[in-house]
């Protein structure tokens, strides 16, 4: 009898061990990884259509369900149904109130330097928990080069490096460059950034009880949204900061990818520097952002007249960065791109024929590279506005308004894709369904 019991126990132990091993292997394969120059998910190459949904991490904090939790769930269902499976989210804002002439988004994760309102991360918890139910992936940026969520300028303000007369007023471009460039040499600023990053990396989701570092819903951590050296004198400190933060993240989280959140040449004005910082062993993939309006690829509101030039320069910009990814043997993501509506209108009812054509061209790159197992591995259009609409008679966002995809300093409706933009969704859906269908067939 004892031999039979012992044999049964041994068999049971073997089965439990095998099941545990299988479960661990399945969990590991559900993380996005990089193999050679491709993303992999569940053992197959992962090419994707994604969206910038930065405010998705803030919706769960809204008191009104229609503007908050209900909206989040409805919009995630909508995105999934349209083939969008990858979302870029803000981790948390720094500071509150007016900065650089605008009211920043919030509530802040770090209201004052070194003080954290950890309940603000409940919003990110909810977004990740709901995304997991829909098999979606998140890219999370840990801070911001720009002021609309506080970002680097707020760290500098806390440490006395923003002159009194410049703390809230709208800065000139040269003033902003001069101020933000000091971040990389400001030791207390960087220490506060590191504390916030470490807090986020150490978080356990209150909804599904998963540690962030063990949650396969997260695809990647991003150092910041569009970190730039801003001035030549800051380049070496900037280079060290990128390497130090990428190493810090990898030391605390072995499961997730790391990227910088970079625009490309326009973020450094030096393609060699762009290549060098992305060559870092702790940086897993490259990104570029493409902004025809901001970079004056068309004049004023003359989008139709300048559209041929927009396409030409976009193709050239992608072509400029693709060889860098090829030399480094890493994936490249077109992480932001956008274009105004026809006639440069902010009205959600205005047509989007030029935007649709522009999206179709960029989406085609991902499809082509997916078919050829190439380096361009995904995209995130800027930006998803979902069910929100700009407030009538009001150009810019105000506290209490529903978030669209356009940050507070930009006209609401400028680059946002609303759920009502059916012609745009037709273009997005075709590629999104094609790529997600291909993954399903391979699994």
Predicted ranges, named:
Residues 7-17:
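Bacterial N-terminal signal peptides
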Residues 18-25:
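Boundary at the C-terminal end of the N-terminal hydrophobic targeting segment
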Residues 299-301:
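Acidic, serine/threonine/proline-rich low-complexity intrinsically disordered regions
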Residues 441-443:
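Short, solvent-exposed mixed-charge patches
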């Amino acid at each position: 009898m004892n031999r039979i019991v012992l044999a049964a126990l041994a068999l049971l132990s073997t089965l439990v061990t095998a099941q545990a091993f299988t479960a661990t292997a399945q969990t590991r394969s559900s993380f996005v990884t990089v193999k050679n120059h491709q993303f992999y998910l569940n053992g197959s190459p992962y090419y994707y259509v994604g969206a910038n949904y930065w405010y998705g991490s803030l919706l769960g904090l809204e008191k009104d369900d229609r503007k908050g939790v209900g909206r989040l769930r409805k919009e995630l269902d909508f995105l999934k149904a349209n083939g969008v499976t990858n979302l870029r989210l803000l981790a948390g804002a720094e500071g509150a109130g007016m900065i650089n002439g605008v009211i920043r988004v919030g509530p802040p994760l770090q209201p004052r330097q070194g003080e954290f309102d950890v309940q603000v991360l409940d919003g990110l918890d909810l977004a990740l928990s709901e995304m997991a139910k829909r098999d979606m992936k998140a890219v999370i940026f840990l801070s911001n080069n720009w002021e609309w969520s506080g970002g680097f300028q707020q760290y500098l303000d806390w440490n006395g490096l923003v002159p009194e007369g410049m703390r809230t007023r709208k800065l000139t471009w040269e003033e902003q460059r001069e101020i933000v460039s000091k971040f990389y040499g400001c030791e207390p600023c960087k220490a506060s950034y590191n504390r916030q990053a470490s807090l986020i990396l150490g978080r356990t989701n209150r909804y599904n009880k998963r540690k962030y570092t063990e949650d396969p819903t997260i695809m990647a951590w991003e150092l910041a949204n569009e970190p730039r050296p801003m001035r030549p004198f800051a380049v070496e400190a900037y280079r060290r900061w990128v390497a130090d933060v990428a190493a810090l993240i990898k030391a605390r989280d072995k499961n997730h990818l790391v990227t910088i959140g970079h625009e490309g040449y326009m973020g450094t004005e030096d393609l060699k520097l762009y290549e060098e910082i992305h060559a870092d062993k702790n940086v897993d993939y490259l990104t570029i952002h493409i902004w025809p309006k901001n970079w004056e690829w068309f004049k004023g509101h003359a989008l139709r007249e300048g559209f041929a030039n927009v396409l030409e320069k976009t193709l050239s910009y992608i072509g400029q960065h693709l060889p860098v990814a090829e030399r480094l043997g890493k994936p490249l993501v077109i992480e932001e791109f956008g274009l105004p509506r026809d006639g440069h209108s902010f009205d959600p009812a205005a047509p989007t024929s030029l935007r649709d054509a522009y999206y179709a061209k960029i989406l085609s790159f991902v499809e082509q590279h997916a078919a050829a197992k190439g380096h361009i591995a995904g995209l995130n259009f800027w930006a998803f506005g979902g069910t929100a609409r700009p407030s009538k008679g009001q150009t810019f966002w105000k506290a209490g308004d529903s978030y669209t995809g356009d940050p507070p300093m930009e006209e609401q409706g400028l680059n946002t894709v609303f759920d009502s933009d059916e012609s745009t969704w037709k273009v997005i859906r075709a590629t999104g369904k094609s790529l997600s269908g291909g993954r399903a067939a391979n699994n």
